[in-house]
Amino acid sequence: MPKSPHKLFKANSFWKENNLILREIKHFRKIAILAVIFSFLAASFEGVSIGFLLSFLQKLTSPNDPIQTGISWVDMILAADAWPIPPIYRISLLILLSTWMRATFNYFGGVYTESAQLNLADRLHKQIFEQLQALRLSYFAQTRSGELINTITTEIERIKQGFSGLAFVLTRIMTVCVYFVVMFSISWQLSIISVLIFLLLAVGLSTLNKRVRETSFGISHANAQFTAVAVEFINGIRTIQAFGTQEFERQRFYKASTNQLNAAIKVVLAWTLVKPIAEGIATTVLISLIVISFATFTLPVASLLTFFFVLVRVIPNIQDINGTVAFLSTLQGSSENIKNILQTNNKPYLKNGKLHFQGLKRSIDLVSVDFGYTADNLVLNNITLTIERGKTTALVGASGAGKTTLADLIPRFYDPTEGQILVDGLDVQYFEINSLRRKMAVVSQDTFIFNTSIRDNIAYGTSGASEAEIREVARLANALQFIEEMPEGFDTKLGDRGVRLSGGQRQRIAIARALLRDPEILILDEATSALDSVSERLIQESIEKLSVGRTVIAIAHRLSTIAKADKVVVMEQGRIVEQGNYQELLEQRGKLWKYHQMQHESGQTNS
């Protein structure tokens, strides 16, 4: 059964190469249609103006002879008895009119084309944002942030240029079509020969365009690597300077930059080869047609001159089309990167539930939970644990024991590989994620501070917080004093990642942020580890006040921070090895007692 026109179009290589752009046009089709209409009108008036220009030149050189351009409709319009004013003036008027009409339509065509490509970039930005918002954290753990930034910025900008290129090709094709109409009206035989030769040229250049397309993937990969290295350099500048690794980073940065340069040169060498080859072949076509026409066809001199005048105007447009198609081929790597991010069949998504979480009534139960960041490497093994409402559950263990990973399962940053997490007897996956997380607050050892004011950082995620509430939580978090000492107090901008704050100050801002949310469930991941002993004591007191009536999951290396917990869970290598009351576990002289002894000897307990 023959394919439908729609399926044939989608099977076409042009669609396959540019479908990212073409499929998005439907979302701003009105703008795109207006751009096409105005571009077509501009192309039409360009063809019309050629006929008038030829007539104008003919009247200047032979004012008494009848107009013979070889274009019958032009000759008819400009016939001597058709107008009450002299021919030279009427032609001048028509040239000016067609020129200004073409300029007007070109202006509107350009405006709508630019508007369409801006809409395209806006849609792609938002689609990628929504895609990244919906993905599990495991995706980000396996993907370099620099590569994502490169896709959101550089690659989308290149695709935006691609839309402009497509619009340019479409405009030039319409212009060439108008020229061919003029040429066919003069000599259909010469026109058919011209079309066949140009088609052969297009087929030949398609081989070069394939080469350009292949090199485009190299430049996209090099751009992604360069951006990743640059982002790591900027984010890690403190560590780089502290370890004196400037020379190592210089070599790494220079290598990434050189790779980007070499990849770009390969693209340029392949791309720029297309236009001169097209120009050489087109000139050969022109000379060959002149020879053929004089040897074979008997056309009036005026018609022949008009035909070749139009053909001379066609050739640069053909060259521009071929050059732009080659440029579009350089964007295939960018297009593939964007499509790879937007693909849904190979991404880890969180399954969102439909039940609105009203709050914890009884307990959170982990039942035979296994979890691994990869399928063949489990981080948690057979975890069975009950976290009771309104009580503090402390997770203790050496680094890498799985404490943070276990806590990350509660707000569904990850889902178990096996087993279930039950909230009041219901699988946590039944609940709508945001309603669940709005009842929680997380203070982690990796505190993120936004490049905005202290006030906005504390109030982040809590709408409608009053000034008094913000000051109060800052006081409870032992942050009010240093905030008031800042140049602009609560209005002080903190810089990227809170670069103007010490580690302890950043931690206290994060604790104040959590206090303001007034959460039912509080997750403290080494929340006081970055504080000095005085601040730690003050924060510990405020956390104890905050914990009253709330469910707290506290993670700490220091035993002093979990001594008053209702339940202590000791973990080793992803397994629970002990759980119970702090004092009871010490009396058993098991794993917790060994941790206690080790830290007591190093002076880290308060006993």
From Swiss-Prot:
<keyword id="KW-1133">Transmembrane helix</keyword>
<feature type="transmembrane region" description="Helical">
    <location>
        <begin position="77"/>
        <end position="97"/>
    </location>
</feature>
<feature type="transmembrane region" description="Helical">
    <location>
        <begin position="33"/>
        <end position="53"/>
    </location>
</feature>
<dbReference type="InterPro" id="IPR011527">
    <property type="entry name" value="ABC1_TM_dom"/>
</dbReference>
<feature type="transmembrane region" description="Helical">
    <location>
        <begin position="186"/>
        <end position="208"/>
    </location>
</feature>
<protein>
    <recommendedName>
        <fullName>Heterocyst differentiation ATP-binding protein HepA</fullName>
    </recommendedName>
</protein>
<dbReference type="Pfam" id="PF00664">
    <property type="entry name" value="ABC_membrane"/>
</dbReference>
<dbReference type="InterPro" id="IPR039421">
    <property type="entry name" value="Type_1_exporter"/>
</dbReference>
<comment type="similarity">
    <text>Belongs to the ABC transporter superfamily.</text>
</comment>
<keyword id="KW-0364">Heterocyst</keyword>
<keyword id="KW-0547">Nucleotide-binding</keyword>
<comment type="function">
    <text>Acts early in the process of morphological differentiation of heterocysts.</text>
</comment>
<keyword id="KW-0067">ATP-binding</keyword>
<dbReference type="InterPro" id="IPR036640">
    <property type="entry name" value="ABC1_TM_sf"/>
</dbReference>
<keyword id="KW-0812">Transmembrane</keyword>
<feature type="domain" description="ABC transporter">
    <location>
        <begin position="364"/>
        <end position="598"/>
    </location>
</feature>
<feature type="transmembrane region" description="Helical">
    <location>
        <begin position="290"/>
        <end position="310"/>
    </location>
</feature>
<dbReference type="GO" id="GO:0005524">
    <property type="term" value="F:ATP binding"/>
</dbReference>
<dbReference type="InterPro" id="IPR003439">
    <property type="entry name" value="ABC_transporter-like_ATP-bd"/>
</dbReference>
<dbReference type="GO" id="GO:0034040">
    <property type="term" value="F:ATPase-coupled lipid transmembrane transporter activity"/>
</dbReference>
<dbReference type="GO" id="GO:0043158">
    <property type="term" value="P:heterocyst development"/>
</dbReference>
<feature type="transmembrane region" description="Helical">
    <location>
        <begin position="163"/>
        <end position="182"/>
    </location>
</feature>
<keyword id="KW-0997">Cell inner membrane</keyword>
<dbReference type="InterPro" id="IPR027417">
    <property type="entry name" value="P-loop_NTPase"/>
</dbReference>
<dbReference type="InterPro" id="IPR017871">
    <property type="entry name" value="ABC_transporter-like_CS"/>
</dbReference>
<keyword id="KW-1003">Cell membrane</keyword>
<dbReference type="GO" id="GO:0005886">
    <property type="term" value="C:plasma membrane"/>
</dbReference>
<dbReference type="Pfam" id="PF00005">
    <property type="entry name" value="ABC_tran"/>
</dbReference>
<keyword id="KW-0472">Membrane</keyword>
<feature type="binding site">
    <location>
        <begin position="397"/>
        <end position="404"/>
    </location>
    <ligand>
        <name>ATP</name>
    </ligand>
</feature>
<feature type="domain" description="ABC transmembrane type-1">
    <location>
        <begin position="32"/>
        <end position="330"/>
    </location>
</feature>
<dbReference type="GO" id="GO:0016887">
    <property type="term" value="F:ATP hydrolysis activity"/>
</dbReference>
<dbReference type="GO" id="GO:0140359">
    <property type="term" value="F:ABC-type transporter activity"/>
</dbReference>
<dbReference type="InterPro" id="IPR003593">
    <property type="entry name" value="AAA+_ATPase"/>
</dbReference>
